[in-house]
Design a protein with these regions (language model features):
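Surface-exposed repetitive/solenoidal architectures
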Residues: 1-279, 369-371
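Extracellular modular ligand-binding repeats in secreted and cell-surface proteins
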Residues: 277-369
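Cytoplasmic C-terminal tails of single-pass
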Residues: 411-423
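Juxtamembrane cytosolic interface motif at the C-terminal end of transmembrane helices
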Residues: 400-411
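Core hydrophobic alpha-helical transmembrane segments of single-pass membrane proteins
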Residues: 391-402
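Extracellular Ser/Thr-rich, low-complexity/disordered mucin-like segments
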Residues: 369-393
Length: 423
């Protein structure tokens, strides 16, 4: 995706994108990104952002923190209408980090009208502050009209650190307004420090850290469904885990319209890392749902031992476009920076594709093929005509020679007969 090379600007996604086989580097961004209702399929993130952002824990201690997600660090950005299906964000680090499907970190940024489905976010960390979120990780701004269905996993690898760990179905920690969001969360948290988990938010706190200001936030008309399974291996126990907010550090917000079907599931066997697979040796069978003109295809994996199920490997249905027209001219390099558009005869959607100026399109390839075929035909015809002409000339020459010989023989015969009569 060429746009990811820019740190700012205004962009609109014009088609669904299957990112199978692409190891995505989180995009640090400060512009406007309009997903236009289109989807990113099979996003895979295994590295953190290039930039860091300052974060704070509940004790107001500061950390330079990395982000991981489709976006790494959003700064004064606006993201709308972006859907994410079948993403796997799997980070292992020793640095402070927050991971989430849309953005790991958000500074005064707005995210709205997005759908996140069948997405897995796992963060294995030994740092002092870290966490996972179902939309964003840590920050400030607004979350509006978002539906997310996520599996979140936090694994603490250093029992001596006594970390500050955060997990939330909407976001892990910070001060983002949350309005009209629907959260489905399946969370797993293995921690040896201080747990801050919530179906909606892990820790709702003052951010940015300007204590002279009064922040009036909004947490309105949200619903949460699911469960967080966790342990807190710490004698100085906190074990914050609630359906809405694990811990609240700032009460200056409007709160109403919250509904939940949520279970807090605390365990006490600290030797077993908590994961979605409830058995030690999962064995999966696969069921493939084919894509249609209206819906994506996907593969559902079911463990025959413990019954755990998840879906991934999303596919886009094949479009049938008879004619494409140029929307953006290519620059004349090998790079595919031109755009063509056509209408699918199966689903009536507008379909876009990239092309390079010096590479002919399928239609042109067909035309070129026809031209080549015509050329070969003409060449073959010309060669055949030449051969025929030669044959005709040879035959005529043979006939002429034959006639000449016959005439000569007749002359000789007549002379011979005259000589015989004289005798």
């Amino acid at each position: 995706m060429e746009a990811a090379k820019s740190a700012s600007g205004n962009y609109k996604l014009m088609t669904d994108i299957d990112m199978t086989g692409v190891e995505w580097t989180p995009w640090d961004f400060s512009g406007t990104f309009d997903g236009n209702g289109h989807s990113i399929l099979n996003l895979s993130v295994k590295t953190v952002s290039k930039k860091t952002m300052k974060t704070y824990d509940g004790n107001r201690k500061e950390y330079e923190t990395y982000g991981a997600g489709f976006f790494g660090v959003l700064t004064g950005a606006k993201v709308t209408g972006l859907n994410i299906y079948g993403a796997r964000i799997e980070i292992s680090t020793t640095e402070p980090c927050f991971a989430a499907p849309i953005a790991g970190l958000a500074d005064d940024s707005d995210i709205s009208d997005c759908i996140i489905k069948d997405t897995y976010v796992s963060l294995t960390d030994s740092a002092k502050m870290w966490g996972t979120g179902g939309i964003a990780g840590f920050g400030s701004g607004n979350l509006d009209n978002i539906t997310t269905d996520v599996t979140l996993v936090c694994v603490d690898t250093d029992a001596a650190v006594r970390d500050e760990q955060f997990m939330g179905g909407a976001y892990a920690a910070g001060f983002l307004n949350i309005r009209n969001c629907s959260i489905t969360i399946d969370g797993y948290d293995s921690d040896h420090g201080y747990v801050h988990d919530g179906g909606l938010v892990g820790m709702y706190m003052v951010y940015p850290l300007e204590l002279s200001k009064t922040y009036q936030g909004e947490v309105l008309n949200n619903k949460v469904k699911g469960m967080i399974t966790f342990f807190e291996d710490n004698t100085d126990r906190r074990a914050y885990c609630q359906a809405n907010m694990g811990e609240v550090m700032n009460w200056t917000y409007a709160y109403s319209g919250f509904t939940s079907d949520f279970k807090r599931n605390e365990t006490y066997d600290y030797s077993v890392t908590l994961l979605p697979e409830m058995c030690s040796n999962p064995s999966y069978s696969d069921t493939v749902t084919e894509a249609t003109a209206a819906d994506f295809g996907y593969t559902t994996h079911t463990c025959s031992t413990c019954g755990y199920m998840y879906s991934d490997k999303y596919t886009i249905h094949e479009h049938k476009v008879d004619n494409y027209s140029v929307v953006k001219e290519a620059t004349g390099t090998d790079k595919k920076d031109g755009i063509e558009a056509g209408t699918c005869s199966l689903c009536n959607q507008t379909v876009y594709r990239e092309y390079a100026a010096n590479v002919v399109t399928d239609d042109n390839e067909q035309t070129a093929g026809n031209k080549a075929s015509d050329s070969q035909s003409k060449k073959g015809l010309s060669e055949s005509t030449a051969v025929f002409t030669i044959i005709v000339v040879v035959i005529i020459a043979i006939i002429i020679i034959t006639v000449v010989i016959m005439v000569q023989n007749n002359k000789k015969k007549r002379r011979h007969n005259r000589q015989r009569r004289r005798r």
